[in-house]
Amino acid sequence: MSAGGEHLKDEGTRRQVVLSGGIAGLVSRFCVAPLDVVKIRLQLQIHSLSDPASHHDVVGPIYKGTLSTMRTIIKQEGITGLWKGNIPAELMYVCYGALQFTAYRTTTQILAQLDPHRLPPALESFVSGAVAGGLATASTYPLDLLRTRFAAQGTERIYTSLLASVRDIARSEGPAGFFRGCSAAVGQIVPYMGLFFATYESLRPVLSGLENMPFGSGDAAAGVIASVLAKSGVFPLDLVRKRLQVQGPTRTLYVHRNIPEYRGVFSTIAMIVRTQGVRGLYRGLTVSLIKAAPASAITMWTYERSLKLLRDFRVAE
């Protein structure tokens, strides 16, 4: 493997990068699916965190904390409730991972041709990460919306299957229904992925030489730190995205039945701050960070190992 921060930029063929990215997304998603469902349930709660009296207006369960939410879901919906939305999520993560790493590799190779006016390494990684994240997010967004809607279903099923959900949304909401909240998603993911890859590329050379690191390498540790830092900065947009994704004719049918009607990113932020306080923008942040650490570590570790395996297999042929 090449040294330093260039390893993600110039190693492997396009096919190897696509396959490795897809495998990384698939493995990571399955491992953290329960935490993702918990996060979505917490993000969709609308009662005030500072006013206990507001709990009386809640229609649906009240979730408090990661473990408590898991127990409630298992008790009311069974263990499979923790994997609701996993099919569209797996499809999304496989496609997202493949597109993300391919776009990142392609963008960095294009930027490398700008000599003698090449960007500084950190800025180059930021731009490449932002482009990769934006393209992958927009391309896979309908699957992200389906994942959220399935995860938000309680004991009463709104959508009976993946195909049925596609037909229902297309019929009742039109093509635009699949892209509710997309602007918040791109607005979130571009700085997130830019910061993630810039931090990852900066930390990996430093951590790669250290022993006894998680998962046996500096790749995973660098992925954890980069993800936690980037995730915290853009979390309010992630929450807004989830609130917008469940808008439409089925808004009052999810496990939280009194989700308000939101229109647009900025008006949603303003309404949440007005009714739930600034803390309302950070519902689910704890579980999101808990999820981000293993998810990013597993993703980067699996990607690196898959790519190495594919490269070694090609050499052995």
UniProtKB/Swiss-Prot annotation:
One GO term of the biological process aspect: thiamine pyrophosphate transmembrane transport
Described purpose of this protein according to its UniProt entry: Mitochondrial transporter that mediates uptake of thiamine pyrophosphate (ThPP) into mitochondria.
Gene3D superfamilies: Mitochondrial carrier domain
Membrane topology (UniProt): Multi-pass membrane protein
Keywords: Membrane, Mitochondrion, Mitochondrion inner membrane, Repeat, Transmembrane, Transmembrane helix, Transport
Name of the featured protein: Mitochondrial thiamine pyrophosphate carrier 1
InterPro entries linked to this entry: Mit_carrier, Mitochondrial_Carrier, Mitochondrial_sb/sol_carrier, Mt_carrier_dom_sf
GO cellular component, one term: mitochondrial inner membrane
Cysteine disulfide links: none
Superkingdom per UniProt: Eukaryota
First and last residues of every Solcar repeat: 12-110, 120-206, 214-309
Gene that encodes it: tpc1
Organism: Aspergillus fumigatus (strain ATCC MYA-4609 / CBS 101355 / FGSC A1100 / Af293)
Alphabetical list of Pfam families matching this protein: Mito_carr
